[in-house]
Curated annotation (Swiss-Prot):
The chain crosses the membrane at residues 93-113. Residues 21-38 have a biased composition (Low complexity). InterPro entries: AB_hydrolase_fold, Peptidase_S9_cat, Peptidase_S9B_N, Serine_Prot_S9B/DPPIV. This is Probable dipeptidyl-aminopeptidase B. The gene is dapB. The active site is at residues 757, 834, 867. Belongs to the peptidase S9B family. It comes from Aspergillus fumigatus (strain CBS 144.89 / FGSC A1163 / CEA10) (Neosartorya fumigata). Residues 114-919 are vacuolar.
Length: 919
């Protein structure tokens, strides 16, 4: 569930970790634009197809029909024939009833036309509304097609982004990038000099690494799914037959490709079919370290043999790769192996899961274990026993070990003042120079940080820095891997090695420079009531410049800045005169960068030159022309960014209004939230997602507020939720909803809330706290319902252990079934094979509802689906269910089924009425 924001979890499916990401909102309520949040999380691929056509057009599917309307004609005709033989009185009654029905139908039809979908505003008009002075936004009489759910799920509204693989040249040249694709003449895999892309410098030609996308080895065709060139660009590491494991991890067959001969061989020639979990180039390009069956191996390219670095890895011991909880909640990746810069040492984790309890995840259709059942056992589910530590249970014991490449020796270094084995979480490892390495660790509850400096040559270590974050502001340490080593360079004013880290400073997260490496006192590079994001992005060692992304302009924006290494001359690289959301990826020497503009207008990407005082644009590599055409053709919602104040805290809000919004009408309102600690959902990225579809096609208002606990609004607002997840967050949702309910254009009797993962928990917690007073409906997907059921590392970071905070866990659990029963109705959906938020959460909730005789809910399970709910078309089904359920809610259908009673047919009611009218 790693989401602390800016990374994972940025779709409606927000895995709970997520991640970290950002953007900035205006300080007024008059700003509207077209930005939204991306539907799909970083590691999540869009649904691979458009899901085909619908059985009914949108107008048919959501058309209001009176119950029984289609069945009226035949009984009516029959009764009229009978009445004809009975005299004029019956005929008069018949025609009176016909006229009444016709009048009712006409009235309903008029109401449908005036209260249904309005004319659609084009995207260009919505873009013009960006500078609107009216707090109500702007409207347009122009027409445009509504956004469809098929488009959203099929990824048609996703911007195109290119990932550039910057590499250093063999002679440390800057501005080189790896590009994949193209014909045989261009080369499938090549290294380009960015300065040659303009076509005015023929002296810098591309170097082709692979001519073809398919490689043949002993008559076998190898189709690589990913490639990694060696640092000297003479070899390429290939992976084929890649299979996903968990969110970030995978296995595959690895091959070493020789550039000169254009031939390949297995990474381990003695075991060509062995599935490898991880492979990493040596900085010297002469060896590859890899993990197979949880053991580390070294392959020197000068030999076909491999050296076993470890031998006892297996089911309970992991070497070089993380276990489930470290992969999900700490590293956000598949590697815990690090080469030293001089290629003399390898650092790696030894993870002991012996004491970690197992949780069974069942699969009823697929067999992800790959095990073929014995004859007669085919009808039993496939069960994966996951070592999954829950709060208060034993955690994996993780140690840092080292391998001396020359001596072929594994060793560890004992450090005084280290955390105990059961109280240690290693969150970052960073090699410095001359065999020195920095290690950042926290205690189990993630509120004490310790930084150690280890010398692998002398095999000694010491504590160099410690921070009691809980004592500072009641907060926690968020795991990150963005610390940067800054080597000594006396000629450039750096007499000692140092590093740049992100630290809490006056209530916000800022950049600090520590030098020498053992200096506990920092030189602050940034300060103020704003925060840096995953910083620093890069360090220019020649000019002493630090590049970073920050929220200096507003919490919902991201701009790129640079500052001198002494903390002076902080300046933006991007245009801060208007709202923007940028990301950046720098070349090896920081002379060039890939600048990505993500919103609020149409996203684009460009290569920039940072050598001078002013940046220059080298090449525009993506302008999303197709997306521009779609924006012009479709009626996107107008987005109004504003702030609200709740209990003295300023919170960011975005309101998505239907096209051609009419303030004289009354609109239903859907609140969408995630709300996890450090996350962000209100930002200035261009996004067309499920919320956009709801506003554009269904005609409802969608509101999102980032309440207390979320990121980039200061540590005071963020840390207040610690130990009591859900309380302040739900309070802020309800308080904001009450503000919207009081607006003249809102129908306060039709308000709903929905979310996924942590957002699912927040949906239920909000309904529980609200008890039907503000929200009538809710939709929770893959929710946590009791934090004792989630994983230990994430949960204890924000809740402490259950032993230290039993009341907090009780308060955060969904327990008040009577309060939930006050809602009109709510929906809960869950993947039956969710390895992240276990199905246990929803099943225990259902049991509580049963025991309390609560029936005002619907539930849906998806077999073999994990937290993202994708298996066998499930992702499409989830969103169609959400859409249909919401329409039924706002159409009043759930009121009709609250207390069902048998009903006689209309024909029987008619006959009874006629008898009563007879003399």
């Amino acid at each position: 569930m790693r989401r602390s924001d800016g990374h994972e979890e940025t779709s409606e499916f927000l895995p709970m970790t997520h991640s970290r990401s950002v953007s900035a909102a205006s300080q007024t309520s008059t700003d509207s634009s077209l930005s939204t949040e991306s539907l799909f999380p970083r590691e999540q691929k869009p649904f691979p197809n458009a899901m085909g056509g619908m059985a009914l057009a949108d107008d048919d599917k959501y058309r209001d029909l009176e119950d029984g309307e289609a069945e009226l004609s035949e009984p009516f005709l029959s009764s009229s024939k009978k009445a004809a033989t009975g005299g004029g009185r019956a005929r008069r009654i018949f025609w009176i009833l016909v006229l009444l029905c016709l009048g009712g139908w006409l009235l309903a039809f008029v109401l449908f036309l005036t209260g249904g979908r309005a004319n659609y505003q084009t995207a260009s008009d919505a873009l013009q509304a960006h500078g609107a002075d009216s707090a109500l936004g702007s409207t347009s009489t122009s027409s445009g097609k509504p956004v469809t759910l098929q488009q959203v799920l099929g990824g048609q509204w996703n911007p195109r982004y290119h990932a550039i693989g910057w590499v250093a040249g063999p002679n440390n040249e800057d501005g080189l990038l790896v590009e994949k694709g193209g014909d045989e003449k261009q080369g499938y895999l090549r290294v380009d000099d960015i300065r040659s892309r303009k076509g005015n410098n023929t002296g810098r030609e591309s170097r082709v690494l692979m001519r073809k996308p398919i490689v043949h080895v002993d008559g076998q065709a190898i189709v690589p799914s990913n490639v990694w060139p060696s640092p000297d660009l003479k070899k390429v590491l290939l992976i084929s037959e890649q299979q996903k494991n968990w969110r970030h991890s995978f296995t595959g067959k690895y091959w070493v490709f020789d550039v000169d001969s254009q031939t390949a061989q297995p990474l381990d020639p003695s075991a060509p079919d062995g599935r490898v979990q991880l492979a990493l180039w040596s900085p010297a390009s002469d060896a590859v370290v890899f993990v197979r069956d949880n053991n580390l191996y070294l392959r020197r390219l000068s030999s076909d043999s491999v050296v076993a670095i470890t031998k006892d890895g297996g089911e309970n011991l992991f070497y070089g790769v993380p276990d489930w909880v470290y992969e999900e909640e700490v590293i956000s990746g598949n590697s815990v192996t690090w080469w030293s810069n001089d290629a003399k040492y390898i650092a790696f984790f030894r993870t002991n899961e012996t004491s970690v309890p197992e949780f069974p995840v069942q699969y009823y259709i697929s067999r992800p274990s790959g095990k073929k059942p014995l004859p007669g056992l085919e009808n039993y589910p496939d069960v994966r026993e996951i070592k999954y530590p829950k709060p208060g249970a034993p955690n994996p014991v993780v140690d840092l070990q080292f391998y001396d490449v020359e001596k072929n020796e594994v060793f560890s270094v004992q450090v005084a003042d280290d955390f105990a084995d059961d109280d240690r979480i290693i969150i970052e490892v960073l090699w410095a120079s001359e065999g020195k390495i920095l290690v950042r660790s926290t205690n189990r509850e993630s509120d004490i940080l310790k930084v150690y400096l280890i010398d692998t040559q002398s095999r000694t270590g010491k504590l160099v820095r410690s921070e009691d974050v809980a004592g500072l502001d009641g907060g926690w340490v968020e795991p990150s891997q963005s610390t940067r080593f800054v080597p000594a360079d006396p000629n450039n004013g750096r007499p000692h090695d140092g590093y740049i880290d992100t630290v809490p400073y006056n209530g916000y997260d800022h950049l600090a420079y520590f030098s020498p490496l053992d200096n506990p006192n920092a030189l602050m590079l940034t300060s103020g009531e704003w925060e840096v994001v995953d910083a620093p992005a890069a360090v220019d060692l020649q000019r002493g410049l630090v590049y970073f992304v920050g929220t200096k302009e507003a919490p919902t924006q991201r701009h790129v800045y640079r500052v001198q290494l002494d903390g002076s001359n902080l300046n933006p690289l991007t245009d801060t005169s208007k709202p923007g959301y940028y990301d950046v990826s720098f070349s090896h020497g920081t002379g060039y960068a890939l600048l990505t503009y993500k919103g609020p207008s149409i996203p684009w990407q460009a290569i920039i030159n940072t050598h001078g005082d002013e940046i220059t644009y080298e090449d525009r590599i993506e302008d999303n022309a197709q997306l521009t055409k779609m924006v012009e053709a479709y009626a996107l919602p107008t987005e109004v960014y504003q702030n609200v104040t709740v209990d003295g805290y300023t919170l960011q809000v975005v309101e998505r209004r239907p096209p051609h919004f009419n303030p004289a009408k009354k609109y239903p309102v859907l609140f969408y939230l995630y709300g996890g600690p450090g996350s962000q959902t209100v930002d200035r990225k261009f996004t067309v997602d499920f919320q956009s579809y709801v506003a554009s096609s269904l005609g409802y208002i969608v509101v999102t507020v980032d309440g207390r606990g979320t990121g980039f609004i200061g540590r005071k607002a963020r840390c207040i939720v610690r130990g009591n997840l859900g309380f302040y967050e739900a309070h802020d949702q309800i308080a904001t909803a009450k503000m919207w309910a009081a607006k003249s254009y809102v129908d306060e009797t039709r308000m709903a809330i929905w979310g996924w993962s942590f957002g699912g928990f927040m949906t239920l917690k909000t309904l529980e706290q609200d008890a039907g007073r503000t929200f009538q409906y809710g939709m929770a997907v893959a929710p946590v319902t009791d934090w004792r059921f989630y994983d230990s590392i994430y949960t204890e970071r924000y809740m402490h252990t259950p032993q230290h905070n039993p009341n907090g866990y009780d308060n955060s659990t969904i327990t008040d079934m009577a309060a939930l029963s006050e809602s009109v109705r709510f929906l809960v959906m869950h993947g039956a094979s969710d390895d992240n938020v276990h199905l246990q959460n929803t099943l225990v909730l259902i049991d509580k509802l049963d025991l309390s005789n609560v029936e005002n809910y619907d539930v849906q399970f998806y077999p073999d689906s994990d937290h993202s709910i994708y298996f066998h078309n499930a992702h499409m089904m989830v969103y169609h269910r959400l859409s249909d359920w919401l329409v039924n809610a706002f159409n009043g259908e759930w009121h009709l089924i609250a207390k069902p009673v048998p009903d006689e047919s209309m024909w029987e009611r008619m006959k009874r009425s006629l008898r009563l009218l007879s003399p």
